[in-house]
Structures are given as C-alpha cells and as structure tokens.
Amino acid sequence: MSTDADTFPADTVDAPVLRFAGVGMRYGRSPEVLKDISFALRPGSFHFLTGASGAGKSSLLKLIYMAEQASRGRVELFGRDINAIAPADRPFLRRRIGVVFQEFRLLEHLSAFDNCALPLRIAGGKPDHYRGDVAELLGWVGLKARMHARPATLSGGEKQRLAIARAVVGRPDILLADEPTGNVDQGHALRILRLFVELNRLGTTVLIATHDEDLVARSGQPVLHLEGGRLMQYGRSGSR
Amino acid sequence: MSDAAFDVQRWRPGPLLPRRDARDGALVFVVAVLCFLACLTALGSLAADRASRGWSSQLSDSATVVIQPRGAESPDAAAARAAEVLAGVKGVTEARALEKEKAEALLEPWLGREALLDDLPIPRLVAVELDPKGPASAESLDKALKAAGVQATVDDHSVWIADIKRAASMTRWFALGVCLLIITAAAAVIGFATRAGLAAHRDVIEVLHLSGAETGFVARLFQTRFATAAGLAGLFGAGTAAAIAALVRLAGGGQGLTPVLPLAWIDLLALLPAPLMAALTAAIAARLSAAAILREMG
C-alpha cells in the first residue's frame, strides 16, 4: 500500500469522523467483497474513492451509511461504533450523512422540489423555514425550471443533480456520493465538484466514489484506491 | 401544473406515499368481502342464539297433563275439572283442556286415521302455560290434581327440554365458533394484504429509512393509509351485510325466514364495530410490518 503526507492510517488520526479498523464484508455466504480495510478520515477532509467495477466502492459506502453491516472489524462514525448504536439512535445518525446513490433513489410520485426537501421534512423542519434554501439549491444545480417535474420526466443528468441536491440540502456532516458525475457532461461534473468543494469548505467531510479519473486529477484531492476489495492506497491523486 | 407556474412560496409538501395504487383497490376489495362474511356470520350467530333461547323458553314455559278419567266422570268433564284446578295453581298463567279432536289429531300421525275408532279410549289432554318468571313445578301440579281427586300424569317436558337445551347450546357455540373463525381469518387476511401492500412500497420505505426517518414516522404513514382503506372497506362490507339482513327481516316478517333464524333490528348494531376493527387490524398489521421491514434494513 502506498501512502504520502496526506495518508490517514486508522490509528493515527485523533477524533476521526470515520474510522475503519480491519473491516471485512460479505453478502450472505459469498466471498468477502471488502477485506481488511483500515483507514480514518479527518473531520472536514475530502477524499475520492476509486477502483474498478466490483472493487468494493459501493459496498464500502453502504457500510458507512448503515445499509449493510461489516462481517468483521470495526466501523466508527462520529466516534461511535456503528454496530453498537441502538436501532432507535440510527435515524439521527443517518441525518448527519448525505448520500448520493448510484441509482438515484428518487421518489417517483414526488416533484423535484419535494424530493429535494425530503431530508429536511424527515428531520422535522417547517416548510416555511426551508423552502427558500431548497429553491436556491435546485437553482444552483440547474433545476430551477424543473422544480415541479416528476423524476420520470427528468433526464439522467437532471436526476443525478436532483439526487445530489437532496444529499446536500441538510448540510450533512459527511457526504457520500456513489458515481455522482456518471450521467452528466463535463461542465456539470465540474459544477457538481465545485458544489462538493464548497460544502467541504463549510466543514462537511466528503467521500466520493468515482470512475472519473479526470475529475479526480482536476481536484487534486486525496484518493482511497480499492482493488479486489482491498485498500491499496490512500494519498494524493497524483501519487499512485 | 407547468414548471413555469411553480410557486415556491405556495408550495406545500406532497404526500410521501403515492396517492393511488392498483394494489390498494385489491386490498379494499378483499377486506370488504371478508368484513361482509364476518358480519353475516355474526348476524347468523345472533339469530341462532335467539332461536335456541326461544326453543328452550317455549318448552320450559308449558306442561302437558294427560287425564285418566275415573268412575262415572266422562273424560271431557275430567279434563275440564283438571283445567280449572290447574288454573288456580301458583305459577300457572293458563290451563286449557284440549278437545277430543285435537287429541286425535295429535295421535293420527302415529296411529293412522283408521285406528282412531270411536270406542278407542283417547286420553284427554290439558295444555298448561306456566309463568316464565316463576313457573309451577311438575310436583305442585301433580299435588293439586291429586288433592282435587283427578287422576292424571303431568309431563313438564323435562326430558325434551334437556335435549333441546343441549342442542340449542351446541348451536349457539357452533355459531359463535364459526363467527370467531371468520373474524380471525378476516384479521389474518387483512394483515397479509397490508403486509403485501407495504412490501410493494419497500422502495419508498428504503429511501425514507436511509434519509433518517424513524420507525414511528414510517409506520405512521402506512398505518394511516391502510387503516383508512380497511376502515372504508369494512364500512362497505358491513353496510352490505346490514342491507341484506334488513331485507331478510322485512321479507321474512313473522312467517318467512325470520322464525328459523330470528333477526331483530337491534342486531344490526352489532355490525357497527366491524369497520373499526378492520381499520384497527390494518393499522396494527401496517405498524408491525413497517417495523419488521425497517428492522431487516438495519
């Protein structure tokens, strides 16, 4: 495994926002898709998660947003062992995580505006308090003219931007994005990256799983690289 | 509404569950049919209960006295005297000597018309109506007859009453059992249908769950949705059953269907809880199913 000055071994970061220690994961009885993963992310850091298809990027993200459980090892989020968190407390932890799903997971019967406002609504916010923020954010991702549109009428790129807007609208402490620029053109990809960087400047820890080598190179942000379910590198994008 | 017409200031949050779903129609239909069947069975069991109580009451409120005339006294005179004596016994509301023709009519099915010869000693009968609140015992009737010098046998139907009461009790329990079985089956099917409806919305649940929705938040959404649907279906099923019962009551009158299964208008009140029970069952099933699905999701 190669590292550089920006590497964050699991046991060398004080109060990490996220820490993996010897984590393995398998689906059912199948072979492990993640093996011996150990790393830690500082609060407010920005990382890319790279690797070929099937390398385990999505699985690693699922462990963080608690859609799956590690079969071994320990995952800590905001200083708490995920496996030890009571089910009743998990929703409150999830509200601190913004997720851009690879398959978007938009609610088809709701408008773009409603989809974007969903996390704020679930958190118990009052519409009068957040409607302005939602409108502004949708304008920022280029969906100002599509606020009332149902997801079925949106293009792939528009859906992706809507999914991103929904993930960041609640100003999460950590943002996870699974191929967030997979369906958008270069211009929109850079705009989305700028949004993530902006959010990161406000203190959100960002972890983006992507195939987009160009985006990674342009950003100059550190990379976690997975190969065959193993973490092979963490460091600057140019250091591989 | 076109996108251009979208007014942010007037926006109100949309429903988190799709408004209409073809599966909801199936749920409403199944619940309505089951509620209808459960209500009909409930009415049937009420009617069976009333019928069985009626049979027992009719038999225990009467007695038959068989007169055996002695000496020169004619059978008719002996029967008339016995009726007079019995009418004065405490716990007797009416005692009536049956004419010879009535006694013959009772015997005819057993002996045939030809056997009823004029010189055949046909026993005279006295029909005694007892006070339901404090009926006279067979012993007190017998004692009064003996005191008046009338030789007679008192039959208080006790042999028949025991059998009838046993049969009536069995009918009542059977009807109640069937009713409970149908209600349980209805509740189970409502539960399964609700679970199936909920599973169909798993994608919505997953998004809400991963966005930080608490179990109670998700459960309430489905609880309200399915309880409303099941309540309306229950109302429809119970309403149809009530309409049929009312028709039976009106068409039956005193001679038609109602003497066999006597329905009273007040019985229809028993159907009132049906929609509520359907809604409650669906709400509980929805809550448990939502909680189970969320538990599976972690």
Q: Where are the predicted features?
A:
Chain A
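Catalytic Walker B motif of ABC-type/P-loop ATPase nucleotide-binding domains
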Residues: L175-D178
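Short coil-to-helix segment of the ABC ATPase nucleotide-binding domain corresponding to the Q-loop/switch region
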Residues: L110-L118
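Conserved ABC ATPase signature
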Residues: R150-L154, E158
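Conserved signature/switch motifs of ABC ATPase nucleotide-binding domains
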Residues: A149, G170, L202
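Conserved ABC transporter NBD signature motif
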Residues: G73-D81
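ABC ATPase NBD coupling module
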Residues: G28, I82-G98, L199-R201
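Helix-to-loop junction immediately C-terminal to a conserved catalytic motif
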Residues: Y65
